């Protein structure tokens, strides 16, 4: 039980440190995606295309008004996911005598990381499609506000994309290392079992302490994997909430500006309505006073004399 609590504390502390390091990495994005495997090269092409879109040059603005950009991104997403799948299948072919439970866990974590990366890439394409619709609706008007919001969203999506791409890269490395380690462990176990049989005859049983150690290592890996998964999900949810709050703030500010403009327009309209009415009432009152004075024989320009 003490070992469990110690493992949890160490893992949580490591997670906190990883969050700090992650913010530093996101603040210092690399000039280009360092590509080694085919899937990384495909992702690099998506990455470079996104950087070009973020410039929001006149050429980009022109192509954003049609479906060319989103179609290009769709092809790049399909190419990247195809290469990731091919690389994963290549690793699976290299799997040696690995425990079924370990393989299932590693495969599940890898699929989750792959799904997050694909979702990030699709979010970029969806946001650009949304901008195209908004820009076409506001054609002929000032679109600086739309471009500002698009640039802000693309920066956030790019950070999330970088983080999840690095996570997928690490998961693939762990999967590859796990298969190699399992294969080496399987070959070593065969040698340990067959060696004494060939030299001495009887098979030697695996020491109980070794079995306990292997079980403890497997249990530790399982706990660490679950904690990493929970931490990643929590960070994703926090990012989503932060993005939603910023979008809500922008919408509230926009609606407040619209309400203020509508109130000013309504005030101007009310003034235009009531000014003629007030002027007409003043004219009618002056006419009434003049008639009363005329009926009483009082000249409007003559002041009444004082009685002695």
Curated annotation (Swiss-Prot):
It comes from the Eukaryota. Its main location: secreted. Sequence repeats lie at residues 75-96, 97-118, 119-140, 141-162, 163-184, 185-206, 207-224, 225-246. GO terms for cellular component: chylomicron; extracellular exosome; high-density lipoprotein particle; low-density lipoprotein particle; multivesicular body, internal vesicle; very-low-density lipoprotein particle. Heparin binds at residues 157-160, 220-227. Residues 1-18 form the signal peptide. Residues 257-308 are annotated as: Homooligomerization. GO terms for molecular function: cholesterol transfer activity; heparin binding; phosphatidylcholine-sterol O-acyltransferase activator activity; phospholipid binding. PANTHER family: APOLIPOPROTEIN (PTHR18976), APOLIPOPROTEIN E (PTHR18976:SF2). This is Apolipoprotein E. It comes from Pteropus alecto (Black flying fox). The lineage of its organism: Eukaryota, Metazoa, Chordata, Craniata, Vertebrata.
């Amino acid at each position: 039980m003490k070992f469990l609590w110690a493992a949890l504390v160490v893992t949580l502390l490591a997670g906190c440190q990883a969050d700090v390091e992650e913010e530093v990495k996101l603040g210092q994005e690399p000039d280009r995606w360092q590509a080694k495997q085919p899937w990384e090269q495909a992702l690099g092409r998506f990455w470079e295309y996104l950087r070009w879109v973020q410039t929001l040059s006149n050429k980009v603005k022109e192509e954003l008004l049609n479906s060319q950009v989103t179609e290009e991104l769709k092809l790049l997403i399909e190419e990247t996911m195809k290469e990731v799948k091919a690389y994963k299948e290549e690793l699976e072919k290299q799997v040696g005598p690995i425990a079924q439970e370990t393989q299932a866990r590693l495969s599940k974590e890898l699929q989750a990381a792959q799904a997050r990366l694909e979702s990030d890439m699709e979010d970029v394409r969806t946001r650009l499609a949304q901008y195209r619709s908004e820009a076409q609706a506001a054609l002929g008007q000032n679109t600086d506000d739309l471009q500002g919001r698009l640039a802000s969203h693309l920066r956030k999506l790019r950070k999330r994309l970088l983080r999840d791409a690095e996570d997928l890269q690490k998961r693939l490395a762990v999967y590859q290392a796990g298969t190699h380690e399992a294969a080496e462990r399987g070959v070593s176990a065969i040698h340990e079992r067959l060696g004494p049989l060939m030299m001495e005859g009887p098979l030697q049983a695996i020491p109980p302490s070794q079995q306990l150690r292997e079980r403890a290592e497997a249990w530790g890996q399982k706990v660490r994997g679950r904690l990493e998964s929970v931490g990643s999900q929590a960070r994703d949810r926090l990012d989503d909430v932060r993005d939603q709050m910023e979008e809500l703030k922008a919408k509230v500010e926009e609606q407040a500006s619209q309400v203020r403009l509508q109130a000013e327009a309504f005030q101007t309209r009310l003034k235009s309505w009531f000014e003629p009415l007030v002027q007409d009432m003043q004219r009618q009152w002056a006419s009434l006073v003049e008639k009363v004075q005329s009926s009483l024989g009082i000249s409007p320009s003559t002041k009444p004399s004082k009685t002695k």
